[in-house]
Amino acid sequence: MSDAFDINDLKRRMEGAVNALKHDLGGLRTGRASASLLEPITIEAYGSTMPINQVANISVPESRMLSVSVWDKSMVGAVERAIRDSGLGLNPITDGMTLRIRLPELNEQRRKELVKIAHQYAEQGRIAARHVRRDGMDQLKKLEKDSVISQDESRVLSEKVQKLTDDTIAEMDKIVAVKEGEIMQV
């Protein structure tokens, strides 16, 4: 095969799309507590905006509770406000330098909304994978047109790119199915 085409670059980009999907799904609230639920929250601290995990330690002491241990006493109020204003519907209770957050039960309607959002994230991931495939196919066509690779090499590499795309999309579908199961579990 030709050195002019690097399928590993496409693999890295597709893995990036899968990781982005995992990150997006991590922010969706399921019936269980998860430290990743608070990852998107940012805090105004020390004259800049920073992620919550840079000013506090997040743990899961119980299946329906999060514990946020703030490292600097002066930041407790800012962390509490940020969690309250995050739009996640969470209400932290302050206990010294620790915030305790009990996660309320999700009702059926909210579960269905979260599943829809998960499917939207999955579609965005599939679109990203298809864009990577399109870039790879365009690159192959150009290499073939410029006589850098033969038609046979182009066909074989095209099949590899398609298989990589199919495998990536199948992996994304599995990830979303697991997340959907977590969301719908009562």
Curated annotation (Swiss-Prot):
A biological process term (GO) from this entry: cytoplasmic translational termination
Protein name: Ribosome-recycling factor
Purpose of the protein: Responsible for the release of ribosomes from messenger RNA at the termination of protein biosynthesis. May increase the efficiency of translation by recycling ribosomes from one round of translation to another.
GO cellular component: cytosol
Keywords tagged on the record: Cytoplasm, Protein biosynthesis
Compartments it resides in: Cytoplasm
Superkingdom as given in the UniProt entry: Bacteria
NCBIfam families: frr
Similarity-based family: Belongs to the RRF family.
Pfam families documented for this protein: RRF
Gene name, Swiss-Prot/TrEMBL: frr
CDD domains: RRF
InterPro entries per record: Ribosome_recyc_fac, Ribosome_recyc_fac_dom, RRF_sf
One MF term in the entry's GO annotations: ribosomal large subunit binding
HAMAP family: RRF
